[in-house]
Regions:
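Catalytic, metal-anchored helix/loop core of enzyme active sites in primary metabolism
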Residues: 1-381
Length: 381
C-alpha cells in the first residue's frame, strides 16, 4: 500500500482528486508538478508541504520559488524538474496525471527506479506501451491503471492465473455528449458543446476525446499494451449510464464486471491502496435506484476517431504515436476555436497519410513520429 506519492500533474482534474484521496488516506506528498498554475500549486504546496514542487514553465517556476521562500520546498522547472519529481527517493508511488506525451520520459524514469506507477497518462502506453511494459518487467516496477475502464479491467483479472483464460476485454464508453448524432449534426458543434460530458467531470482534452470517441480508441490500444493482448481480444461498447466501468469475458463463458458510481476517486483510491481496499467517505452505488443499464455498438462511421485508432492498433509501430500526436494537436486547435469538431478526425487522418511510419520502436523513433505528426497537423490548419 502507498505511503508517499509524487504527483505529476497536480493541478488538473485527476491531480486535484488524487490530493483529495491523499488527504483522506493520510498519505505523504513528496513532490507536486504542474505546467504553469502558480496559484493552485502554491495552495497545494502549503497544505501538503512537499519536498519538491515543479512548474514546467520556467517563468511560472521563478514566481513560485519567490512565493515559497518561507518554506523548505525546493522549486524546479522544465523536464529536469519532472524527472526529479518522478524519481524522488521519498515517494514509493508516482501518480502520472499529466496529459499528453510529456509524461513519457518521467514515467520511464520512475519505472527504472522500481516505483509503483499509478498511471493516468494513457498516452504513455498508447505511444510506447511495449517499451514501458518491458521496462516495468525489467526493473520490477508495478503499474496500476487509474483510468476508470482500465482500473475495472485490472480489478476483474485479479483472480486470473493465466492470461490465456481471457477471451476478451470489453471497455465501456458513455458515448459522450454527441451520442446518436449524424456527421452533419456534428459539424456545428462548438467547444462549449463538446465540454458538456453527460456523466464525468474531466479535463478539457480528455472530454473532447470522449466526444470524438478517440478516448475509447486510445484506451483500446492502452488495454492491448497493459495486458499484451491482440486487437481482436479488446472490444468497446456504448454504455450510456457509466455504471459498468468495463468487463472481462473468460474462455469458459463467465463475464466479470466492475460497477460503481462515475467518480474518479474510486479508481484513484484503489491505485493508492492496492492490493487492499480502504473505506470510502463518498456516495456508493445503490442498485435499487440505478437506471436501466443499456449497451450498444459504437458508430465508427460517424465517430471516425475510434476507427482510426483501431486501424493504428492493427498496424503497430509508430502509427499509434502519430495518431496520438496528431490528435493532441488537433484537439488543441479545436479548443482554441481554430478548427471545427469534424476537422479533428480529418486532421488526424491526414497526418497518418503523410507522416512516414516505421515498424521499429525506439524512444527516439516514437518522439520523432510524435513531432512529425504535430507538424503535419499544424501545416493543415
Amino acid at each position: 500500500m502507498t505511503r508517499s506519492i509524487a504527483l505529476l500533474g497536480s493541478t488538473g482534474s485527476i491531480g486535484r482528486q488524487t490530493l483529495e484521496v491523499a488527504r483522506e488516506l493520510g498519505l505523504t506528498v513528496a513532490a507536486l508538478t504542474a505546467n504553469s498554475s502558480v496559484d493552485l500549486i502554491e495552495q497545494q504546496a502549503r497544505e501538503f508541504c512537499p519536498r519538491l514542487a515543479v512548474l514546467y514553465d520556467e517563468a511560472a517556476a521563478a514566481e513560485l520559488r519567490e512565493r515559497l521562500r518561507d518554506m523548505k520546498t525546493q522549486v524546479l522547472s522544465g523536464m529536469e524538474g519532472l524527472l526529479a519529481a518522478a524519481t524522488a527517493e521519498d515517494a514509493d508511488t508516482v501518480v502520472t496525471a499529466v496529459v499528453g506525451m510529456i509524461g513519457l520520459k518521467p514515467t520511464l524514469a520512475a519505472i527504472e527506479r522500481g516505483k509503483r506507477i499509478a498511471l493516468a497518462n494513457k498516452e504513455t502506453l498508447v505511444c510506447a506501451g511495449t517499451l514501458v511494459m518491458d521496462a516495468a518487467e525489467k526493473f520490477g516496477a508495478e503499474i496500476v491503471p487509474v483510468d476508470s475502464e482500465h482500473s475495472a479491467i485490472f480489478q476483474c483479472v485479479q483472480g486470473c492465473r493465466d492470461r490465456g483464460e481471457i477471451k476478451r476485454l470489453i471497455l465501456t464508453c458513455s458515448g459522450g455528449p454527441f451520442y446518436g448524432l449524424t456527421r452533419e449534426q456534428l459539424a456545428g458543434k462548438t467547444r462549449a458543446d463538446a465540454l458538456r460530458h453527460p456523466n464525468w467531470t474531466m479535463g478539457a482534452k480528455i472530454t473532447v476525446d470522449s466526444a470524438t470517441l478517440m478516448n475509447k480508441g486510445l484506451e483500446i490500444i492502452e488495454a492491448m499494451r497493459l495486458y499484451r493482448l491482440p486487437l481482436r481480444q479488446v472490444d468497446a461498447i456504448i454504455h450510456r449510464q457509466s455504471i459498468v466501468h468495463s468487463l472481462v469475458e473468460y474462455r469458459d463463458g463467465a463475464m466479470l464486471a466492475q460497477l460503481g458510481t462515475p467518480d474518479m476517486k474510486l479508481p484513484i483510491r484503489y491505485a493508492m491502496t492496492y492490493p487492499y481496499r480502504a473505506e470510502t467517505p463518498d456516495r456508493t452505488l445503490d442498485l435499487l435506484s440505478c437506471p436501466p443499464l443499456t449497451f450498444a455498438a459504437p458508430d465508427e462511421e460517424t465517430f471516425r476517431c475510434l476507427k482510426l485508432a483501431r486501424q493504428c492498433a492493427a498496424v503497430g509501430g509508430t502509427a499509434c504515436a502519430i495518431l496520438n500526436g496528431a490528435n493532441e494537436e488537433a484537439v488543441g486547435a479545436f479548443l482554441r476555436d481554430a478548427v471545427g469538431f469534424n476537422d479533428i478526425p480529418a486532421l488526424v487522418e491526414a497526418a497518418l497519410e503523410t507522416v512516414e511510419q516505421v515498424s521499429a520502436l525506439t524512444l527516439e523513433e516514437i518522439l520523432a513520429a510524435d513531432h512529425a505528426a504535430r507538424e503535419a497537423v499544424r501545416a493543415h490548419i
